[in-house]
């Protein structure tokens, strides 16, 4: 896209009638729309009173092209929608979410300092991303890729609250820990990072001691390497 216009959603904006919505969003502030493409069932305006029939009539009046798009479905017949994508992610169904998105789901954030458990106790240095409220898959271990400084690295990822170390640190905020498996040299602190989630391995769980967790991490890494072999980095 050459430009993106962000509109602040307010009560006044939500109360606009469809006609007001068209004028304020498509024909004001230097914007004069030439064509509009929306989903066939898209609704807008107060009380969702605007629809594709209204837009088709308005397009003739204002002289812009209007292209309604039919619903897209998965091969199993499921309608592809933001609601369906959120549900797939909440259930940890990354394959379905990726099919509907047309790409693997990613999380983004700036690498911050963690508790150093992975480095000091597990010999497995990680990059930590604090997870804000939003659309997140279930806590657990994932195979994926870390994108940083224009490069893509295979990575083992853990989303969760590090239950094995909770007795030592008390409450631990939910975070994504990434262990880059190959090729990266240097420090990640302060860098903006994209975590591309490819496959869910197992739920997060509490281990009796760090040594048990360390053994499981090695098993996880072996499995993750097998999963990511089919991808070219």
Where are these regions (language model features)?
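A conserved beta-strand->alpha-helix junction
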Residues: 1-12, 70
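Secondary-structure boundary/capping signal
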Residues: 3-4, 63, 105, 232
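N-terminal alpha-helical segment
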Residues: 5, 78-81, 193
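Classical nucleotidyltransferase
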Residues: 12-124, 147, 208-214, 218
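Phosphate/ribose-recognition catalytic cores of enzymes acting on nucleotide-derived substrates
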Residues: 62, 114-233
